[in-house]
Amino acid sequence: MNLFTEMRGLVLEALEQMQAEGALPQGLDFANVAVEPPRDAAHGDMATNAAMVLAKPAGQKPRDIAETLAARLAADARVAKAEVAGPGFLNLTLAAPVWQRVVGTVLLDGTAYGRSDMGQGKKVNVEYVSANPTGPLHVGHTRGAVFGDALASLLDYAGYQVTREYYINDGGAQVDVLARSVYLRYLEAHGQAVEFVDGTYPGEYLVEVGQALKDKVGDAYVGQPEEVWLEAIRDFATDAMMELIRADLAQLGVKMDVFYSEKSLYGTGRIEAAIDSLRAKGLIYRGTLEPPKGKLPEDWEPREQTLFKSTEHGDDVDRPIMKSDGAWTYFAPDIAYHYDKVSRGFDALIDVFGADHGGYVKRMKAAVSALSDGRVPLDIKLCQLVKLWKNGEPFKMSKRAGNFVTLRDVVDQVGADVTRFVMLTRKNDAPLDFDFDKVLEQSRENPVFYVQYAHARVSSVLRRAAEAGIDTSDTALRAADLGLLGHEAELAVMRKLAEWPRLVEIAARTNEPHRIAFYLYELAGDFHALWNRGNDVSELRFIQDGDEGTSQAKIALARSVAVVISAGLAILGVTPAEEMR
């Protein structure tokens, strides 16, 4: 049940009645009529812009429309008050039974409360992490992994059919560097002294890979030229790194549906097929690009190249797809990969990249637009940097990794649940400070604790109720007299619960899972406020001695809070706490 959708339906019904009676002309478009929370809660529970958006096409003053509409809405039992404000905004205050009904709906639906069919089963591909298979995941990958995973869960909750995908960058030069680095560790495992020069990976995580290679092939590659061992070690090392990365993701609770190899695009005709598709649309040509201002990109050459006419699909400049020597640019396999996604029948694509890929957005959107004839939208979400702090100082790098803080460093310090929640306490395109000390504090300033504490408090109420012999079964709580919940602090919690279905749809429509974390913090705040009021006002306590009926109504409210928190945390990939330790 989306109460805002229900009340919008009431507004539209009243507008149609006004049309039937001649108070409004026929043929008006109601598509932009909205019912939303007011900017100022003091103005009521909901507000509608109906009069403002209909005034011009109706040829009437907005305030006149609003006053007629207000009179009609006030006649409905669900509306306690309808007031016209300013030039024609209409504020609605709903009757208490409307809010009380929300509690019953939450208890009846369980964690399915707020689920939406907005997606209508459309197929969405969410690609995230996609780190080079050259080492363990670092903290930047961690943010992208959490964001992408939570977004995929959110879209699933909103009715989409979601595929979670990891693109393995195993076709580029960095994999050759990995192979050479592993070869050095292989020689080291044979007792040779080695030196890591610039352009190799010195991380200790490759020691085990070098030893494993020795165990597999013995001394077969010792003293051999690179052409003998490069390809074999490249495959061996990539497999080892992907096993490491899969283990990192598992530690964070991230499971992919598809691991797609870049290497599979080469020698299979897939790149050629994608480029041929663009060529058939007149979007491939031979030409020379003007040198861009500032630092020259690696794919620019002062000679004729094969170019993609990406400017016809919103890009700033056309992009090289083949170098003058006939080799593909790095953009060509990316085009082919997204052509494959489009060919798999996805209705929408989402790519989650690091902030350093900002210059990549327009060209990739242009490619997908061209490949799909504008049918398949691509949304690219960029995750900004994470700064780590401990004891008031920047957190030092992992010796094992060589030069960066790993995902495991973070999860080992605070656990997967805390890591995931904190990574979603800022919008993805805003920098995030991750303070190892603060995220473990038991205070309101720590949103992880604050939300989990609300859920744990509900669990404690249920345990105390059981000890007092109060029936808190689903049947008993659903049958409770919710009309006993009339205090403003209780109604505030119910109003927040009513926002959940609408919030889910907004977050899914904008691809912004951080909205879920923000909402949970606000819901927890309203619940804690009610709890704290109970310390001073005995009738607000959840267990009323000697009054099972009132206790059951109040416990029903508490239980509904826990249900929604559980649903929200599930989207974020966080396990709700039954008690705080």
UniProtKB/Swiss-Prot annotation:
Subcellular location: Cytoplasm
Domain of life: Bacteria
Reactions it catalyzes: tRNA(Arg) + L-arginine + ATP = L-arginyl-tRNA(Arg) + AMP + diphosphate
Keyword Aminoacyl-tRNA synthetase among UniProt keywords: yes
One GO MF term attached to the UniProt entry: ATP binding
PROSITE patterns tied to this protein: AA_TRNA_LIGASE_I
Enzyme class (EC, first level): ligase
Segments carrying motif 'HIGH' region: 131-141
GO CC aspect terms: cytoplasm
Gene3D superfamilies (UniProt xref): Arginyl tRNA synthetase N-terminal domain, HUPs, Isoleucyl-tRNA Synthetase, Domain 1
Subunit organization: Monomer.
Similarity comment text for this entry: Belongs to the class-I aminoacyl-tRNA synthetase family.
PANTHER family according to UniProt: ARGININE--TRNA LIGASE, CYTOPLASMIC (PTHR11956:SF5), ARGINYL-TRNA SYNTHETASE (PTHR11956)
Protein name: Arginine--tRNA ligase
Gene field: argS
